[in-house]
């Protein structure tokens, strides 16, 4: 059994939600706002040369040049949006496959569909990438399945692979990406 909305609210409170959420299992506006707020990190640590070398060696390379090139090309140089949120892409077709439900949003149209698409940047011009708003809306329906339906970080690794990457739950993978660039590279390697 995956994380419930009530467990998500408890997790958000433990990770700095402000104001504290009522842990009632009802995912409303405050839960959506808190979800986005706790993942903002404008001071995320950049990867060091030693960490890059560690990643390169784990991939069988003794030079950081190739892994640096991959990082530059794959992410336009950064794993974060200007807002301080880690880069993600909402994949509505994954959410549909996992939930078997078509969901509509007044702002974003379909957030769950058998087909991919509906990729938007900032349709409501509020400075928050739409993938984050779609995710915030979807975690209020099914947190685990929503978090498995995003590609995360500098290298856009799908959340559905959280177990293979050594995370206990999908939210741990996103939290790791929030904290440092090194974690983005570890997901790739």
Q: Where do the model's predicted regions map?
A:
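Acidic helix/loop microenvironments that form the catalytic cleft of cell-wall polysaccharide enzymes
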Residues: 26-38, 71-77, 156-160
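Exposed boundary/loop context
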Residues: 18-21, 70, 146
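Export/targeting segments at the very N-terminus of extracytoplasmic proteins
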Residues: 37-138
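Short secondary-structure junctions and interdomain/linker hinges
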Residues: 19, 77-78, 143
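Short acidic, glycine/serine/threonine-rich helix-capping segments at coil-helix boundaries
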Residues: 1-47, 57-61
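Alpha-helical segment that forms one wall of the substrate-binding/catalytic cleft
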Residues: 4-14, 40-41, 54, 108-189
């Amino acid at each position: 059994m995956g994380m419930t909305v009530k467990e998500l609210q408890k997790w958000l409170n433990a990770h700095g939600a402000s104001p504290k959420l009522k842990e009632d299992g009802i995912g409303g506006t405050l839960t959506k706002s808190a979800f986005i707020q706790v993942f903002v990190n404008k001071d995320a640590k950049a990867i060091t040369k030693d960490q890059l070398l560690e990643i390169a060696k784990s991939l069988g390379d003794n030079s950081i040049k190739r892994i640096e090139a991959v990082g530059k090309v794959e992410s336009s140089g950064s794993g974060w949006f200007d807002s301080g949120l880690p880069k993600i892409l909402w994949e509505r077709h994954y959410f549909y496959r996992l939930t078997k439900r078509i969901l509509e949003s007044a702002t974003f149209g379909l957030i769950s569909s058998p087909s991919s698409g509906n990729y938007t940047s900032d349709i409501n011009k509020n400075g928050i990438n739409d993938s984050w708003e779609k995710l915030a809306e979807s975690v209020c329906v099914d947190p685990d399945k929503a978090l498995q339906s995003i590609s995360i970080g500098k290298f856009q690794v799908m959340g559905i692979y959280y177990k293979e990457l050594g995370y206990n739950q999908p939210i741990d993978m996103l939290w790791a990406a929030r904290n440092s660039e090194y974690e983005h590279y570890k997901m790739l390697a």
